[in-house]
Amino acid sequence: MKKFVSILAMAGFAAAISADAFAASPDVYVVNFRNDKNTESQVLDTQLSTALALVGGNAEEVVIDTSTAAKWEKGAHEAFDRNIVPVFNQWVGLPGFAAVVDADSKRIIGCVNSQFNANEMAREIEKMTARAKGQAFTSRASTGGKTTKCPPAYNVDPG
């Protein structure tokens, strides 16, 4: 009986590992640069949460929070785990927007900020996700002149 339980436990462990290994990876990372003291960050958090729920599983939020040293460090680890450290380095310390990054190529596709409402933000993230997958996205909706252009780099290598 002990042998059977051991075999069953090993089979369960192997199944758990393989399920994680084959879990669907996102098409894009939505890197939310935020700080508790920044009003735009607070607005963006709510809108981005709703937008990501509308978009579904093709986008994964990565939070880079500079409110405390512990949150900053957690964000650095999350960026490292997803191999997007250059994105982290470029804008850490500049809160109030989210960069959309192709999960495969790690290329920055565009950015959204608190000027977008949740529906507009979801639509823009869907467009950027389609672009990351090499697909066309057709929409007649207008975002009223709002741009998905990212802010200039906040941290520039002096060398």
What are these regions (language model features)?
Residues A19-V28, I84-F88:
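A short beta-strand-turn-helix
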Residues S25-N38:
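Short active-site neighborhood of thiol/selenol oxidoreductases, capturing the structured segment around
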Residues E40-G56:
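Typically the conserved alpha-helix immediately C-terminal to a functionally engaged Cys/Sec
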Residues I7-A16:
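Bacterial N-terminal signal peptides
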Residues G56-A79:
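Thiol-based oxidoreductase modules, predominantly thioredoxin-like and allied folds used
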Residues K71-P95, A99-V101:
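Short, internal strand/loop/helix patches
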